[in-house]
Amino acid sequence: MTTFTVIIPARFASSRLPGKPLADIAGKPMIRHVWEKARRSGASRVVVATDNEQVKNAVLQFGGEVCMTSEKHNSGTERLAEVVEKLDIADDEIIVNIQGDEPLIPPVIVQQVAANLAKYRVNMASLAVKIEDVQELFNPNAVKVLTDQAGYVLYFSRAAIPWNRDEFADIAANTKNLDDLRLGDHYLRHIGIYAYRAGFIKRYVQWQPTALEKIESLEQLRVLWYGERIHVELAEEVPAVGVDTPEDLEKVRSILTAF
C-alpha cells in the first residue's frame, strides 16, 4: 500500500460562507468530518493547515494535528508549501491535498490518487469522472480535463473540451437543443483532489503565475505550462457535493444526519 501524508487546507474566511470549517454538521465541525475521512484513507499522517486560531483549537480538541500558516497566501498550494517546509517533510514523500470543505469525500479516492502518483512516477496526479449531464459540460464551474490515451493531461478548461465542431456549432447557432446531444466517454470533469511529491510543491510555488492559468482561473495549468506532466485516472467512487454555499451546507447536513 502506498504511504502518503494528507494535508487539509482550512481557511476560516470565506466570502460565501464565513467560518466554513467550523460549520456544524451532525454534531461535529465540518473540518472534523474531512479529517475523519482522511484518517480512514490509510494516510500515515493527516495535518490540517490553517491561519485561524479557532480552527486550530477545534482540531486540537478532537485530537488532530495542526500547522499554523500565513494569512497572506494567494493559493492553497502556497499553504501546502509552507506546511512542507515547517514540518520538514522529505522531498520524496507523497502529499495528498484534500480541501477542508469536502466532508463527503470518499476515503477510497484519497488512497487512489496517492497510488496513481506512485504508479506513474509523475510529480502530480489527480482524478476525474465522466460527464453524463450535458448541462454540466457547458457549466464553467465544472472544470473539464482532456487527457491522452495513457491518462496524461493535455489541458484543463472551464470550456467544453474537446469541442465537437459539428454538434456544438448547431447549439451555438440555436438550431439544436442541448438535451439532444449524446456525450462520448472522452468528456471528463476534473475532481479537485491532488497528489504531489513534497519537493515538487516547493518547486511549484517558485514558478511565476502564467497567462493560461489567469485566463481560465485554474492554478493547475501552471504545471503544464512549465513542462511537467499530470496523470489523471477515473475516480473509483464519485464524490458527493462539496460545501461552497449555505445551500450546499444544508444538502450535506441532510445527507450526514440521515446516517
UniProtKB/Swiss-Prot annotation:
This entry carries the following GO cellular component terms, namely: cytosol
Q: Tell where it localizes.
A: Cytoplasm
Q: What is its EC number?
A: 2.7.7.38
Q: Which Gene3D superfamilies match?
A: Spore Coat Polysaccharide Biosynthesis Protein SpsA, Chain A
Q: Which SUPFAM superfamilies match?
A: Nucleotide-diphospho-sugar transferases
Reactions catalysed, semicolon-separated, are: 3-deoxy-alpha-D-manno-oct-2-ulosonate + CTP = CMP-3-deoxy-beta-D-manno-octulosonate + diphosphate
Which keywords fit this entry according to its UniProt record?
Cytoplasm, Lipopolysaccharide biosynthesis, Nucleotidyltransferase, Transferase
Family matches, as Pfam families: CTP_transf_3
The Gene Ontology biological process annotation of the record reads:
CMP-keto-3-deoxy-D-manno-octulosonic acid biosynthetic process; lipopolysaccharide biosynthetic process
- Where does this protein act, in terms of pathway? Nucleotide-sugar biosynthesis; CMP-3-deoxy-D-manno-octulosonate biosynthesis; CMP-3-deoxy-D-manno-octulosonate from 3-deoxy-D-manno-octulosonate and CTP: step 1/1; Bacterial outer membrane biogenesis; lipopolysaccharide biosynthesis
Q: What is its main location?
A: cytoplasm
- Give the enzyme's main class according to its UniProt record, as a single word: transferase
Q: Which domain of life is it from?
A: Bacteria
Single GO MF annotation: 3-deoxy-manno-octulosonate cytidylyltransferase activity
Q: Which HAMAP family match?
A: KdsB
Q: What does this protein do?
A: Activates KDO (a required 8-carbon sugar) for incorporation into bacterial lipopolysaccharide in Gram-negative bacteria.
* Homology family: Belongs to the KdsB family.
Name this polypeptide is given: 3-deoxy-manno-octulosonate cytidylyltransferase
Taxonomic lineage of the native organism = Bacteria, Pseudomonadati, Pseudomonadota, Gammaproteobacteria, Pasteurellales
Q: Which gene encodes it?
A: kdsB
